[in-house]
Design a protein with these regions (language model features):
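Membrane-interfacial helix-loop connectors
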Residues: 58-113, 192-263
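Selected transmembrane alpha-helices and immediately adjacent juxtamembrane segments
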Residues: 1-31, 38, 111-212, 273-295
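Interfacial loop-to-transmembrane junctions
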Residues: 36, 260-279
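Active-site-flanking structural segment that lines cofactor/substrate pockets
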Residues: 39-66
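Cytoplasmic-side transmembrane-helix entry/capping segments in multi-pass membrane proteins
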Residues: 45-46, 83-88, 270-275
Length: 295
């Protein structure tokens, strides 16, 4: 019982320190989505084969919504496969607010976002320009659909249809993610204290070369909680930076789930899911090799 109370109090203090940063981050996100959502959608839909650039930049906005929008646009053939993949690979949803709430990790956050954006644009251009002719026409996407025929908006109103203040939506997101962070941190702390930090670190460390591959697989879970899980594991020292990048590159939030629901071709959906995993695993392993070579 004493062990539980010690871990509980330590977890409560650590997570409570994040609240102000989390709330400010979500307040900014809600403002951007509410005031500029339609412009952002128009920018994404109008990119053509160059759509990987706005796709990667918009994917950085920390919420699951833009990956869902991209999935709807791709299913309606408004955007290309390269643009879709750029959005998926750049999406970080809850990981950004979580790292923003930890000033000690701001340098890692900047590095993470630079890597993800550059890599997302690279993959997008590779698919839309270099490999375009090698892909089936039905898989390429783009050009045949119209953005105004696709409804991608998230409701920000109460049960009676009245507009909801953005601070309320931001507070709701903050509390939701706070509860998850607290619960995960508590369970993680109890496991580490019970098993021992050395044993736990040894298990993850023994994955060696395959840790980014496994992290990329975890990132495919169509839930924003997956990115929180991997970020917390990284902060706790149980996950390498290369594995964090791999997991967050495949962590497209609800984007893949929406794709499976709205795109009628299961073969295309399976290919895109596998491609997302392969791209995430590749960049993670690549970073791991570079770090090992430099060291």
């Amino acid at each position: 019982m004493e062990l539980f109370l010690d871990v509980l109090s330590e977890t409560l203090v650590d997570t409570a320190k994040m609240l102000p940063f989390l709330f400010l981050a979500y307040l900014f996100i809600e403002y951007v989505e509410t005031r500029h959502g339609e412009r952002i959608e128009a920018l994404l839909a109008g990119g053509g084969r160059w759509g990987a650039v706005p796709g990667a930049v918009l994917g950085c906005v920390p919420q699951c919504g833009f990956s869902a929008i991209a999935s709807n646009f791709y299913a309606s053939r408004v955007i290309t496969l390269g643009t879709l993949m750029a959005v998926y690979l750049a999406t970080s949803d809850e990981a950004i607010p979580l790292l923003v709430s930890m000033p000690a990790y701001w340098d890692k956050l900047i590095l993470l976002m630079v890597i993800k954006v550059v890599y997302a644009v690279f993959v997008g251009f590779l698919l839309d320009f270099v490999l375009r002719k090698a892909l089936p026409r039905s898989l390429r996407g783009g050009y045949t659909g119209h953005a105004d025929e696709v409804d991608c908006h998230e409701e920000h109103s109460d049960e009676e249809g009245h507009p909801q203040p953005i601070w309320k939506a931001a507070l709701r997101h903050t509390l939701e993610i706070f509860v998850f962070i607290f619960a995960f941190s508590l369970v993680f702390g109890l496991i580490v204290e019970g098993v021992g930090e050395d044993v736990f670190a040894s298990v993850l460390g023994r994955m060696g070369f395959f840790q980014p591959v496994v992290a990329a697989l975890v990132g495919l879970v169509p839930n924003c909680a997956a990115s929180v899980l991997m970020t917390q594991l990284y902060v706790e020292g149980a996950l390498r930076f290369s594995s964090l990048v791999a997991g967050l590159c495949t962590g497209a939030g609800v984007g893949l789930a929406v794709l499976w629901r709205v795109n009628p071709s299961w073969k295309q959906n399976l290919f895109i899911t596998g491609l997302t995993w392969a791209c995430g695993a590749a960049v993670g392993v690549g970073i791991q090799i570079v770090v090992a070579f430099i060291a």
